[in-house]
């Protein structure tokens, strides 16, 4: 009896280790990018500003990490956000705050909800950088794989 109990415990422990290892193997870090410019705004403006974003999403921890570089704006940035859900050229509300008066490079992390992650993974998020001259957004870029 004692041997079969130990054997059952060891088999259960081995199965638990296999399940845990399999779950870790499913974890994934997805890399996204965005190219920001005035022409990507639904109503383009004459800004010469440009930017790029590198964004990663860890599917296990649900952590979003970003670095956004930008320059050539008409003035200091006043706000920056991730917006969504929206297709390219469409507007949407703020999904996630990047910062107030951000400077380049703007860096940050956040934990996403399942709905936010689904919109991000579906290509329905964009980054918008605002200035006093372009309060609705001066440069914008869709976040894509």
Task: Briefly describe each language-model feature range.
Residues 2-5, 12, 17, 22-80, ...:
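Metal-centered catalytic cores of metalloenzymes
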């Amino acid at each position: 009896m004692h041997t079969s109990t130990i054997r059952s415990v060891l088999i259960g422990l081995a199965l638990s280790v296999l399940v845990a290892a399999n779950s870790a193997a499913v974890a994934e870090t997805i890399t996204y990018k965005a190219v920001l410019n005035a022409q990507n705004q639904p109503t383009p403006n004459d800004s010469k500003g440009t930017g790029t974003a590198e964004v990663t999403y860890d599917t296990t921890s649900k952590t979003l990490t970003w670095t956004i570089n930008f320059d050539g704006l008409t003035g200091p940035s006043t706000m920056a956000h991730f917006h969504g859900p929206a297709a390219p050229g469409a507007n949407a509300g703020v999904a996630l705050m990047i910062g107030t008066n951000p400077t380049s490079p703007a860096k940050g992390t956040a934990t996403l909800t399942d709905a936010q992650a689904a919109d991000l993974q579906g290509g329905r998020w964009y980054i918008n950088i605002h200035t006093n001259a372009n309060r609705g957004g001066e440069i914008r870029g869709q976040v894509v794989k």
